[in-house]
Amino acid sequence: MSTKELYIGVMSGTSMDGVDCALVEFDQEQVRLIAHSDYPMPADLRQQLLSVCTGQATNLKQIGELDHRLGHLFADAVMDLLSQAGVDASQICAIGNHGQTVFHQPNGEFPFTTQLGDANIIATRTNIDTVADFRRKDMALGGQGAPLVPAFHQSVFALQDSTTVVLNIGGIANISVLHPTRPVLGYDTGPGNMLMDAWCETHTQQNYDKDARFALQGEVNEALLNSLLQEPYLHQDAPKSTGRELFNMEWLTAKLQGQNYRSEDVQRTLCEYTALTISKEVERFRYGPTPQLLVCGGGARNPLLMQRLQQQLSHWQVSTTDAKGVSGDYMEAMAFAWLAYRHMHRLPSNLPEVTGASRLASLGVLYPKA
C-alpha cells in the first residue's frame, strides 16, 4: 500500500518579492520536490505591506483588507502551481501556509507575532484543507516562534562526522546547526538581504542588487562597518529571532548619522556586514575534519556575498543546498509543506532547544476546506 502523500507549502518572506509555492511528495519521512512556482506580488500590495512592517501609521481597516487580499493572493498562487503541474486539488492532502509576517515581537511582557493572509479564503477557494498560524503555539509555550525551519533541516540532511550548518539568506539570515553529537541549534544571525535590498531600492530603484553590481562599484567603509557591528542584537545569546521591526531603513539611517557616504560604499559595506555577522556565528560551531556550510535563499545568488563567506570561512566547505539535492530557492516553502504534513499526522514539529519553548508541540491550525 502506497504511503505517498502530496502537500503544498506557501511562503512569502520578509523580502516580500513574491510568493514561493512548492508541491512536495512525502513517503513516510522521505521528501521530494515535485513542482514549484514563483507568483508575483502586486507592487501596490508590497508597498502597503512594507509601510506597515516599518511602523508607518496604519489602522484595523487596512490590516483587515491586507489580510483579505493576501488570502486571495496565496489562493491564486496555489491554483497557478496546480495548473502548471497538471495536478488536481483533490490529490493534495493539505496546504501549509506561512502567511506574511508584518510584526514579530517574541520578547517583552506581551510576546506576539502577526502573519496576514486569511487561511479561510485559501481553503475555500482552493478546496484544499489549509494549515496556517504555525508560530503562535510555540510562543504560547514560551518559545520565540522562530526559527521553525531547523526541524525540517534536521529531517532532510543526514548527520555527518562534522558540523553541517544550513544557512538561509532571505531578508533575515538564519542558521540551523546540525552537530554530530549535540542537539540541533537554530537562530537568526541578523540581516540577510534586507538592508542591502532597501538601500539598493532607495538609490537605484531596483528591488535588489542583481549580481552585486552596485556593491562591486564601492568599497567597505570600516568606520561604518564598525558602527553597524555594535548592534546589541548581535551579542544576545540564542534562542533569538529578529526581523524588519529592527533591521530597517530607519535603523540604518540612524547608524549613518548624517555622514555623506558614497551610496555604493554603503552597499558594499552592508554586504560585508551581512557576511561578517553570518560567518562569526557559523565559525563558533566548527567541529570535525570537514565542516560544511549549505546556503539557500535569495542571498545564495549574490556572488559577492558568497565569495566573502567562502573567504571568511576558509576551514569550511561552502556550497548551496542544491548541491545536496534540496532546492535552495524553495527550501522554506518545502519546510511549510513539511510542517503541514506533521500537523495532519499529529506529529511534533518544533524544536524546544531551538525556539526556547517548554515542550514539543504539533504546530499550526487547520482550516478545513468544507
Curated annotation (Swiss-Prot):
Pfam families: AnmK
Residue positions binding ATP: 13-20
UniProt xrefs under InterPro entries: Anhydro_N_Ac-Mur_kinase, ATPase_NBD
MF-aspect GO terms: ATP binding; kinase activity; phosphotransferase activity, alcohol group as acceptor
Keyword Phosphoprotein set for record: no
Described function: Catalyzes the specific phosphorylation of 1,6-anhydro-N-acetylmuramic acid (anhMurNAc) with the simultaneous cleavage of the 1,6-anhydro ring, generating MurNAc-6-P. Is required for the utilization of anhMurNAc either imported from the medium or derived from its own cell wall murein, and thus plays a role in cell wall recycling.
Name the UniProt record assigns to this protein: Anhydro-N-acetylmuramic acid kinase
Protein species of origin: Vibrio vulnificus (strain YJ016)
